[in-house]
């Protein structure tokens, strides 16, 4: 096992910069996930680590060794590709043994290692089959097993679950986590799936357009995203972004005013007429219930009495069993935006219904509309 360190890694293809000044260090034994939309550079980073790409500039270390000029076969890393890259003419056992044979390991030890790995992945009954005789999930396990059999210092997995159906993907994701906990091998995992990123990672590296947006533990990034891009990418359903203007101590959203809490005014110090973007997750929007000053809980809560509802029009109702996802429209000055709201399954709504909601301002995010940078909290 080994740590992995990237120092200002840049990769250019003629006039195109795929990744720029990428720097981070993965401690020995940790599971890091590179996440971002297609074309953000995550696969280029992985291919650079494994040695399939050469950095235009910067330094790459595996353990204490600078590996810029070390060929892939000598880096002692193992990669699992999206399409598994199994040899179709070989049996499962031969696929598992391939990397060991290429390193001239003793045949007896190869057989022992293959059997051990196959048992650990519950594929020992498949050793004599060819890849075409396997399901997608079984092929994925064989690809993992081939990497494990080599006992590498670093695992690299490039979207290994993307070809699996939803249920199998969930099951295999849990198995991957258990496998890492058992083996403790430094792992770099590439995905565009934010659920995989949140559930698997010790640390997440958020990327866009070849640059790092944020690095951190999944829950800390979810709770305090550095910018709008990260905020809307992590979370399912995605965070709502509402264009607003600060005026008269309130947020003007379309033609509706939402009173701005004093705590936000004090920290944000907004200017009169300043354009802002309000971010709120669907689970932090509540159906508005009018309250009166006689309510015991509100007698000393002045702010609660000032809460102003937001009126929406229901467009789509998506029952999810344990709850319902509502997609509603919010009229703006020049167009309209879609707002997603999670409501209890007991709430019955239809397309065209009016829906009055209130935002949980304790869970509100505010972004700069020009740069996307987080301004609050």
Regions found by a protein language model. Name each.
Residues 50:
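Helix-to-loop junction immediately C-terminal to a conserved catalytic motif
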Residues 72-229, 233:
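ABC ATPase nucleotide-binding domains
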Residues 35-37:
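The feature captures the beta-strand-to-loop junction immediately N-terminal to the Walker
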Residues 250-377:
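Non-catalytic connector elements of ABC transporters
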């Amino acid at each position: 096992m080994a740590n992995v360190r990237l120092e200002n890694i840049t990769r250019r293809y003629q006039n195109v910069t795929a990744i720029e000044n990428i720097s981070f260090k993965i401690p020995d034994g940790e599971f890091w996930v590179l996440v971002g939309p297609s074309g953000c550079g995550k696969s280029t980073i992985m291919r650079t680590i494994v040695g399939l790409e050469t950095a235009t500039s910067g330094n790459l270390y595996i353990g204490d060794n600078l590996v810029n000029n070390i060929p892939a076969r000598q880096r002692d890393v193992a990669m699992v590709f999206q399409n598994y890259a199994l040899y179709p003419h070989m049996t499962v056992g031969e696929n598992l043994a391939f990397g060991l044979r290429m390193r001239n390991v003793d045949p007896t030890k190869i057989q022992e290692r293959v059997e051990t790995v196959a048992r650990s992945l519950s594929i020992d009954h498949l050793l004599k089959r060819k890849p075409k005789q396997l399901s997608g999930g079984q092929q994925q396990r064989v690809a993992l097993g081939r990497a494990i059999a080599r006992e590498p210092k670093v695992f690299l997995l490039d979207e290994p679950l993307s070809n699996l159906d939803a249920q199998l993907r969930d099951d295999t994701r849990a198995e991957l986590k258990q496998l890492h906990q058992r083996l403790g091998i430094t792992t770099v995992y590439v995905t565009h799936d934010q659920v995989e990123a949140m559930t698997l990672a010790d640390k997440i590296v958020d990327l866009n357009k070849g640059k790092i947006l944020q690095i951190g533990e999944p829950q800390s990034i979810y709770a305090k995203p550095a910018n709008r891009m990260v905020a809307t990418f992590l979370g399912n359903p995605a965070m709502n972004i509402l264009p607003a203007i600060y005026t008269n101590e309130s947020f003007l959203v379309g033609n509706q005013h939402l009173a701005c809490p004093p705590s936000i005014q004090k920290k944000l110090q907004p200017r009169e007429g300043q354009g802002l973007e309000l971010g709120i997750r669907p689970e932090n929007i509540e159906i508005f219930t009018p309250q009166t000053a006689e309510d015991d809980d509100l007698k000393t809560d002045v702010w609660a009495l000032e809460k102003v509802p937001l009126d929406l029009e229901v467009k789509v109702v998506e029952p999810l069993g344990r709850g319902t996802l509502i997609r509603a429209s919010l009229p703006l000055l020049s167009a309209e935006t879609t707002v997603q709201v999670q409501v209890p399954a007991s709430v019955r709504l239809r397309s065209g219904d009016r829906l009055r909601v209130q935002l949980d301002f304790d869970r509100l995010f505010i972004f700069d509309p020009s740069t996307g940078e987080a301004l609050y909290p």
